Swiss-Prot record:
SMART domains: MoCF_biosynth (SM00852). NCBIfam families: cinA_nterm, molyb_syn, PRK03673.1. Pfam families: MoCF_biosynth. It comes from Escherichia coli (strain SE11). InterPro entries: CinA, CinA-like_C, Competence-induced_CinA, MoaB/Mog-like_dom_sf, MoaB/Mog_dom. This is CinA-like protein. HAMAP family: CinA_B. It comes from the Bacteria. Belongs to the CinA family.
Length: 400
């Protein structure tokens, strides 16, 4: 099996000053191309350290993706490190220099002399185009390893990997079949509870069950070879049965996107009134393109469940909205949710049974509870659902 590794560079990445989202994206993207990473390393802006690790990994990896260090400043050392590791010099890539000059000219700017550095590549390098920036990439062969050097800007990195590097890998290597990966996301049950229920299922050969907890949700992932797809799809029915009503969506699209599509398909507009969630619902749904009308965030105030229910009923009527959703303020570990619909208004009062979670986590959980309440109504289900440490203590229905 092809041994693929990644090397992230830069002091800011090494010291945790920025999150290495490029590494997470590449690992996930390559995994779904049948190229799971076998190792990831991070090195700072030190020429000796870079040369050392390039030479070291060249003895072990078949492919190494090097990210960062292709900019115009003195701490951008990747091209020099690659040339030094190979024992050769840097040469000016005249065509890329002209392309950079054109890039700046079209934007009404004069290219700084320091940018010339970005056109200096190791003598034996294969040029890799960057259609969205000034840092071209390049590839070199060092010992057994084919190394690709890529820019650190995420948008440039992703374009280069998808459109330049992956096609080269497909040309040069015999890649395995793409793995089958089935995913669903749950809300309301703990990871240990789900695992205990699912561990009794018999997995086909080469198939693994994975769990990813990211408060307030848990993702279940069944991964295996394409040869086992039929058996996996049969097993997946059992996984969904065991997970039960905690399943909120399948795939990777996300709940806000699925709710948005359902609202559009059914021609429902939605108005929101948020207190404790502070605009999280509006943010998540607007990013997904949901048909939102007037949305408000108001200061927290103590309300009875009846007050919340009547208020959101009036708001739906006043804004001529198809649906209206409210999250009340948080008082004494209690919170109200209310959803006004053409069928009536449905309201829940919940109680938090623990105080150990941060404000941000509590807000995320409550936003998900509100979205799940909306999802369940759209699917014709009872709107009440509980979370492991949130208990529904009162419910109310107002008739149309």
């Amino acid at each position: 099996m092809l041994k693929v590794e990644m090397l992230s560079t830069g002091d800011e990445v090494l010291h945790g000053q920025i999150v290495d989202t490029n590494a997470a994206w590449l690992a996930d993207f390559f995994f779904h191309q049948g190229l799971p990473l076998s190792r990831r390393n991070t090195v700072g802006d030190n020429l000796d350290d870079l040369v050392t690790i390039l030479r070291e990994r060249s003895q072990h990896a078949d492919v190494l993706i090097v990210n960062g260090g292709l900019g115009p400043t003195s701490d951008d050392l990747s091209a020099l490190a690659a040339a030094t590791a190979k024992g050769e010099g840097l040469v000016l890539h005249e065509a890329w220099l002209k392309e950079m000059e054109r890039y700046f000219h079209e934007r009404g700017r004069v290219m700084a002399p320091s940018n010339r550095k970005q056109a200096e590549l190791p003598a034996s390098a294969e040029f890799i185009n960057n259609p969205v920036g000034t840092a071209c990439g390049f590839a070199v062969q060092l010992n057994r390893c084919l190394m690709f050097f890529t820019p650190g800007v995420p948008s440039e990195f992703k374009v280069m990997v998808e459109h330049e590097i992956l096609p080269r890998l497909r040309e040069r290597f015999s890649l395995p079949q793409l793995p089958v990966c089935l995913r669903l996301t749950t809300f309301g049950r703990s990871e240990s509870d789900l695992a205990q229920s699912l561990d009794t299922l018999q997995l086909p050969p080469g198939v693994t069950m994975g769990y990813r907890s990211s408060m307030p949700i848990i993702e279940l992932k069944l991964t295996g070879p394409a040869s086992e797809q039929q058996a996996m799809e049969k097993l997946w029915l059992d996984v969904k049965r065991v997970a039960g009503q905690s399943v909120i969506f399948e795939g990777t699209e996300g709940l806000p996107a699925q709710i948005s599509r359902e609202l559009q398909n059914r021609q429902f507009s939605l108005t929101l009134s948020e207190q404790f969630t502070g605009g999280l619902l509006a943010l998540q749904l607007s990013r997904a393109g949901a048909p939102l009308l007037a949305c408000e965030v108001v200061p927290s105030q103590e309300e009875t469940l009846a007050q919340t229910a009547h208020w959101i009923t009036e708001r739906r009527a006043n804004h001529f909205a198809g649906l209206a959703l409210a999250v009340s303020g948080f008082e004494n570990e209690h919170l109200n949710f209310a959803l006004a619909t053409p069928d009536g208004t449905f309201a829940l009062r919940v109680r938090f049974s623990t105080t150990r979670y941060s404000l941000a986590i509590r807000q995320e959980v409550c936003a998900m509870m509100a979205l799940n309440m909306l999802r369940r109504w759209l699917n014709g289900q009872d709107i009440a659902s509980e979370h492991g440490w949130i208990e529904v203590i009162e419910s109310m229905t107002l008739s149309v």
